[in-house]
Amino acid sequence: MTLNMMLDNAVPEAIAGALTQQHPGLFFTMVEQASVAISLTDARANIIYANPAFCRQTGYSLAQLLNQNPRLLASSQTPREIYQEMWQTLLQRQPWRGQLINQRRDGGLYLVDIDITPVLNPQGELEHYLAMQRDISVSYTLEQRLRNHMTLMEAVLNNIPAAVVVVDEQDRVVMDNLAYKTFCADCGGKELLVELQVSPRKMGPGAEQILPVVVRGAVRWLSVTCWALPGVSEEASRYFVDSAPARTLMVIADCTQQRQQQEQGRLDRLKQQMTAGKLLAAIRESLDAALIQLNCPINMLAAARRLNGEGSGNVALDAAWREGEEAMARLQRCRPSLELESNAVWPLQPFFDDLYALYRTRFDDRARLQVDMASPHLVGFGQRTQLLACLSLWLDRTLALAAELPSVPLEIELYAEEDEGWLSLYLNDNVPLLQVRYAHSPDALNSPGKGMELRLIQTLVAYHRGAIELASRPQGGTSLVLRFPLFNTLTGGEQ
């Protein structure tokens, strides 16, 4: 019989019979050389055959196995319920598959994945049990080791205070930890990476960004760091190609407290710089006032010398005049410079943000500060800290005067616009102008600039070649306008 005839009569029994006729020992040879452990028992479950793979697996020779019950291999590690389920299935003449912990001849235990099939004769009577089993101890050990590693890794990741997330090449989340899930829940169930508007593809390996995000109505600052992870394909079609698009590990840490501490430190340093600027301006203003007061008698002495003649020999008059001139020169040398920093161009929005941060705690339900700009792209020019000190002096003055009018809630409006090369700052409030001009502060001698805010503002504005205008508002209150030249105005358009 040819193979074509066998295929034409595609019946398993016919094919098996034909192969047996052509190759009488084929099936026996196949079973003998099979790498799978195969055993055959009679209907009473006594072993009547075992192939070499079975003997190698169990440690018993074929002679030792013949006429023995397979319970010879059983161990107490397999639960009794497993055997009961197995025999219940086999007695119903159904095949059974499961896992058993068997014992070798040397006492060693091993785990097998076993298939037992009842073999029936043509009359449907049970004649044999065919068992094929594979030792899966090594694969099970590796599987459990991997599971333990995954459990350990998940436990470690979930106990890390930072959020950890792995994304694929399309920025889809592949794995995340409990902290990341908590962040997403706090964001109203939205994906945290989407809220941060961050893409690892746009960040280089090891790159770090500090980004703000609104969590439960409050702004929090998160540090985002990325690392590339080598990928291994999970698709069966890429079994022989051990490569896959790289994934990205992202660690997201809450640095809000550190950010707040840094910001508070920066504001404290800014306060110190502003206080130093106010103090220098107060000293300069006081010395200028002293120079003006001293200049009058010195001019009178100079006039007297001219009337008497410079060579008249009036020693006392000449000595008084020289002492006065030297005193004037000493005072001039003592006048501090107001140049605490170099002139520069800076954006106005962060400037106003700093002003609001400095005075946020001083405004409550009875005091309101509103800041507006004609354009979000406005810039200022000059010494940023000194111009900030100008606004600070005015706010200090206004808040102090408003405290004397407890029945009137304070409202301050700050508006900025650019007007033909000048930056104009409009400060409007509801404090009467007369009180602003003539109010006296009892703390003028105890605090730098206290009680002389308007004069100090004039000094700082004049130093920046600016202009100041103080007027009463038609609807009541005071309007202070500060005008500062922009860079183009001072340089004739050259930058």
UniProtKB/Swiss-Prot annotation:
Required for the inhibition of NifA activity in response to oxygen and low level of fixed nitrogen. InterPro entries: DGC-Regulatory_Protein, HATPase_C_sf, N_fixation_neg-reg_NifL, PAC, PAS, PAS-assoc_C, PAS-like_dom_sf, PAS_fold. Residues 94-148 form the PAC domain. Keywords: Nitrogen fixation, Repeat, Transcription, Transcription regulation, Two-component regulatory system. Residues 23-93, 151-174 form the PAS domain. Changing R465S: In strain: NG13. Changing L425F: In strain: NG13. It comes from Klebsiella oxytoca. It holds the Pfam family PAS. It comes from the Bacteria. This is Nitrogen fixation regulatory protein.
